[in-house]
Amino acid sequence: MKSFRPISLTSFLLKTMERLIDRFIRDGTLVRYPLNKNQHAYLAGKSTDTALHNLVGRIERALNNKEYALGVFLDIEGAFNNASLASLLNVMRSKGVGDTVIRWIDFMLSNRIARANSGITNLEVCLWKGFPQGGVLSALMWILVADGLLELLKKTGHFLQGFADDFSILVEGIDLGTVCSVAQFAILQVERWCKEHGLSVNPRKTEMVLFTRKRKLDGFKPIQIFGEELQRSDQVKYLGVILDSKLTWQAHLTSKYNKAVSTFWQCKRIVGKTWGITPKIAHWIYVAIIRPMLSHAGMVAASRTGCCQNNAG
């Protein structure tokens, strides 16, 4: 049932009202009380590129200093469906949002009914938590809630980065035992925050990578989240980019190269010498489909793009 999400059908007038409130909060409240700088989703000037640049920059600095960098990549389970309305309203009050806006959002989210028709019977359920899927305000409401977690880890001196409902903890240090202990404490803070806000993290979808160029891993300690031990991986796919433990970019570039070649040959099947699409359309396919595959997050892997040029040649 987790795969089924209710479609939020709202009128043009309501969408317009949501857009006005969204702009009012962004241009007013968030200017006076800005969100944590480590949130990279749904904000002007932020994107997957800025998130990757920020995270990879810290990892590269740790490797250059011959330190360990332990990354734990978390996914908040059903974030938009399970977010607490009370948590949102508390955050909005702390940010100084006006009472009128808070009451309007409270009324909008508290009076929702989901209807399902199985062909045999109809079912109606009152929704008392979560944000409407596809709603104009939903993205802003979630990053307001998630800002509390980012600020909590900031106060305890830990690095936590967010992109929508994807979070990454990164702990750097010269002593591996200390790095593991600090990471475990950070995870405990995440667990506590999730319990307070009615959310959870799926341990099976949580990935842990130890970034290092050292061969010996003396002092490594097992790390748990919600009672389950995390398994250490050699690589992780984060925001569409494969980060390997030594940050060689080999796995990522090979994956992108193979995908681009496969897509190219699929497109080539619809082109012939005397039939098919025109050269102009073929060029458009390359520019619109193939090139974005290769250029995504290209700046973070710039040091290793030479191997792509060799393969292309």
Predicted regions and their residues:
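A glycine-rich phosphate-binding loop feature that marks nucleotide/adenosyl-phosphate handling sites
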Residues: 166, 202-214, 284, 307, ...
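Short amphipathic alpha-helical interface segments
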Residues: 66-70, 202-207, 276-286
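Conserved pre-catalytic core of RNA-dependent polymerases
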Residues: 1-132, 140, 171
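Conserved helix-loop functional segments at active or binding sites
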Residues: 60-61, 114-115, 151-155, 266-269, ...
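Basic, alpha-helical interaction scaffolds
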Residues: 227-301
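Short, conserved micro-motifs composed of acidic
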Residues: 119, 185-188, 199-234
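Catalytic palm active-site di-aspartate
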Residues: 5-6, 39, 43, 69-79, ...
